[in-house]
Amino acid sequence: MTSQANPQALIEQLRLLTADPAAYFQDDVQKRDFQKLARQAATAVEEPFETMQRLVYGPLPLVTARIGQDRGIFDALAKSPEGAALDDVAQASGLPKGVLESVLDYLCTQGMALESQPGIYKPTSLTHMLLVPLFNDAVTHFHDNCLPAFYALNNVLDSPEQGKTAFKVGQHSEEDFYTWMETHPVQQGAFHRFMEAQFAALPTWLDVVSFDTEVAADVQPEDVVFVDVGGGNGSQCAALKKLFPSLPGRIILQDRPAVLSKALQVPGMETMAHDFLTEQPIHNARAYYLRQILHNYDDPTCIHILQMHLPALQHNPSSRLYIDDKVLPDAKPPASAPGVEYTAALSLAMKAMFDAQERREKHWRWLLDQAGLEVVEIRRFTRFDDAVVVARRRVQDQWR
């Protein structure tokens, strides 16, 4: 006979944990086990109607968080740690009290605010967190840029029209995401800041590639050691120079002219206008680096992008492609395992925004083979399946 937990004792334990979560867990593994079981328990005890409500109102946390940020609600609460009256929040937000109260009521259910007494609202730790630039930008990006695409996704899944993405349908635009952002500076800024900040505390490809000894050994000053293909503002060039300030050889940042005009000022970094859908003009470089580019494109386009590098790789046996992207494991972990929900959601986001996807290891190997390349090795560097795929021109084709 299996022993049963005392529900009241379990409730008391959860209250204690909620009051001081940092004191409860010995390590991250234990914490992740708890998170997994807590989610499973919450789902298991739901009534069917409660499950339905959770699903159909799923977009509201993001929608109300955007309202809270955009209308100054979170700012007003953060400035009133002892509590702000509904009238005061209404004045700060410019919203009618009726709809504002509905918004605040929902924010309270999500822990984004607290009604300490009738009509008095206080900030919570989540209120303050949502005012941090990283989270502010994340909410703006996913609400303004992605949410319309998510809504349109089902309508385009079986669309035969080439280039018709859920993003274009959701935004009522004929422009792709990156072109569209050029005329939407608020959303563009939020996206780029979020993309840079979300990875700031995580390991990077340079934690698993000893660039100075593996890539740059015997490099001469006139040699090209690093080409950052579609490298945006040059943050990876900056990271490389910061780690190896005396690195010999040339470092080249490639992107569209409009992007290069906003690039970081990195000592020793050259800039070059280049469309990676055309042939790579720099030959014989040691490293051609593509960071989070290929997951924005379907297989035929990825194969084309990769093939555009074949001539550049032809004559230097030390030339390599370094593809910094998600590499999902071929053997799927349990759906409740840490990070699985995130990577599954990200793959759907790629489908909605670009008609693309995240790829498993066997998919990457097939893709590179189709392009005339071979995988040298794959090195993973985060628990979210971030990896660097090191590839070269197929040996039998190397000097054709």
Go through each PLM region and give its residues.
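Alpha-helical subdomain
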Residues: 2-104, 115, 215-400
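N-terminal auxiliary segments of SAM/dcSAM-dependent transferases
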Residues: 5-45, 98-197
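Short, flexible/disordered secondary-structure transition segments
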Residues: 27, 52, 164, 202-205
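Short, exposed beta-strand "edge-strand" segments with a Pro/Gly-rich flavor and a Y/T-containing core
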Residues: 116-123, 168-177, 203-215, 290-297, ...
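Single, functionally critical "micro-switch" positions that shape active/binding sites
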Residues: 123, 200, 255
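Short, Φ-rich (hydrophobic/aromatic) sequence segments
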Residues: 139, 153, 189-199, 203-206, ...
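Loop-centered beta-sheet repeat module
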Residues: 184-239
